[in-house]
């Protein structure tokens, strides 16, 4: 009897500690790309990663986009029992619920609507038609059900039961058709997204809607810039302020123009209002060289402050305070790194792209990580590195105080990666990948020629890596196992599995056999 009680207690403890969800792009509303609940994969066993399964989906790529990072919920009550579900979104207005244990499809949903009159120019990678925003999954309701929120290519927001794919509430308009929205963020029942590149003639702005509002009033703030194209949309701080990079453009605050910077907007009195902003002091030069700010920040607690890190194609990382992003003149960061890469000021194949990552280790050290594309800057020499970096890498920095000021201290730089993408940290391991994408947009003999068919043909394949989070040492490489590249996607990590999707609409699940 005593042994039985012990077994029951152990089982109960396991059921309480097992779950590690990934309900939104970037892991959480702060976009930290940190998985705090991973227990299965460790520094010691990650070298044994294998492809547990891969599934070819019927999603049709549009321009260079295909599948987005899957969302993972570990306990979903379905008609076939409790399932761990990977919710995969595809550019062609598709949602797929996949049984994580088997790699089999549980349900699929396709959003049907009349073809919009306006769309981007065919062949233009900047403006694909269809669903461009990673969905978001809300917390369980009183009955334990989970709703997911997805923004279709016609600009309508769908509320769907994760267990069966059925619509839960009437859909409503939350944007314009083919507006190129970015990853949805859910904070206190308010959904945020951003739009960019003026696709199909649509505005570039932050969008918000309160799901509790019976009228579903759509609130926006427009910085009048080239586009808010941070990979994971907006990051939301503890005050509910949504922070998003504004892309290329001018800075003229007297006329409410906030290009080449980072803005923070918050819902107040039924409106989305600008609360603060940061603009680099060299924004004019950044605009001239198309080295815009386009990196979703990662927000974190540090001592008694709430800070954030972001970056730009110039290849610098900026450390900012959410309470005063750029000081009194909005142009003074807490800290700005020297150039990590991009000595040649290349607008297309170098610099920091996408989003950041941050975590705190068991000793209380706060880390900030950034990916970059291209060759490392010759003057940047971190204390630990792993050979020449010609195509991209991940850099880890420690957030430290020095003489009363906060700074970013380089700790390590990873091995060379073919266009390094935003990393994920879980249980002392950094998961990163080179996307294998051909990012070239301009040529000496023909000038600007940014066409999807050219870039797709010249792309190779992605490679997944696992690194020691404290040293950057390579622990695992997928080598040639992944057979296609991906564009503007990302990683998800939960419950001993690492997920990556590719342009050919294949979702890969890596893990340890038997777990």
Where are the model-predicted features located?
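Blade/loop signatures of beta-propeller domains
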Residues: 20-52, 71, 395
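Extracytoplasmic/lumenal domain signature
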Residues: 39-64, 77-82, 93-129, 137-180, ...
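Bacterial N-terminal signal peptides
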Residues: 7-15
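Bacterial N-terminal signal peptides that target proteins for export
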Residues: 1-6
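General structural concept
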Residues: 68-74, 86-88, 96
């Amino acid at each position: 009897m005593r042994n039985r009680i012990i077994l029951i207690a152990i089982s109960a403890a396991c059921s309480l500690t097992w779950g590690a969800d990934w309900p939104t792009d970037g892991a959480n509303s702060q976009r930290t790309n940190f998985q705090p609940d991973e227990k299965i994969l460790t520094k010691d066993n990650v070298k044994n990663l294998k492809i547990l399964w891969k599934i070819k989906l019927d999603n049709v790529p549009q321009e260079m986009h295909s599948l987005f990072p899957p969302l993972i919920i570990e306990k979903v009550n379905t008609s076939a029992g409790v399932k761990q579900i990977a919710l995969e979104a595809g550019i062609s207005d598709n949602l797929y619920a996949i049984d994580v244990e088997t790699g089999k499809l549980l349900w699929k949903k396709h959003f049907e609507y009349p073809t919009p009159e306006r769309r981007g120019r065919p062949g233009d990678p900047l403006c694909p038609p269809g669903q461009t925003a990673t969905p978001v999954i809300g917390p369980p309701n009183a009955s334990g059900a989970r709703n997911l929120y997805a923004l279709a290519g016609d600009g309508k927001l769908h509320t769907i039961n994760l267990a069966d794919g059925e619509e839960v509430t009437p859909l409503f308009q939350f944007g314009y058709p083919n507006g190129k929205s970015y990853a949805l963020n859910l904070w206190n029942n308010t959904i945020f997204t951003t739009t960019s590149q003026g696709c199909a003639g649509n505005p570039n702005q932050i969008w918000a809607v309160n799901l509790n509002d019976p009228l579903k009033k759509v609130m926006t703030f427009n910085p009048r810039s080239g586009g808010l194209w941070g990979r994971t949309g907006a990051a939301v701080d503890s005050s509910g302020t949504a922070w998003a990079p504004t892309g290329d453009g001018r800075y003229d605050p007297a006329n409410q123009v906030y290009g080449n910077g980072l803005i923070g907007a918050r819902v107040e009195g039924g409106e989305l209002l600008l609360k603060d902003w940061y603009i680099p002091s060299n924004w004019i030069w950044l605009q001239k060289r198309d080295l815009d700010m386009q990196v979703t920040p990662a927000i974190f607690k540090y001592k008694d402050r709430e800070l954030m890190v972001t970056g730009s194609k110039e290849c610098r990382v900026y450390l900012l305070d959410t309470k005063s992003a750029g000081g009194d003149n909005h142009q003074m960061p807490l800290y700005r790194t020297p150039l990590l890469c991009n000595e040649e000021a290349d607008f297309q194949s170098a610099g920091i792209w996408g989003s950041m990552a941050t975590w705190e280790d068991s000793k209380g050290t706060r880390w900030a990580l950034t990916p970059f594309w291209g060759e490392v800057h010759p003057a940047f020499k971190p204390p630990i590195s792993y050979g020449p970096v010609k195509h991209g890498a991940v850099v880890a920095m420690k957030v430290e105080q020095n003489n009363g000021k906060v700074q970013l201290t380089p700790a390590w730089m990873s091995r060379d990666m073919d266009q390094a993408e935003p990393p994920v940290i879980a249980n002392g391991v950094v998961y990163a990948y080179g996307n294998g994408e051909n990012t070239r947009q301009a040529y000496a003999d023909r000038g600007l020629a940014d066409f999807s068919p050219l870039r797709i043909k010249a792309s190779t394949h992605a490679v997944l890596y696992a690194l020691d989070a404290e040293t950057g040492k390579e622990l695992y490489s997928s080598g040639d196992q992944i057979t296609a590249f991906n564009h503007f996607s990302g990683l998800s990590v939960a419950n001993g599995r690492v997920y990556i999707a590719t342009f050919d609409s294949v979702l890969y699940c890596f893990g340890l056999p038997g777990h």
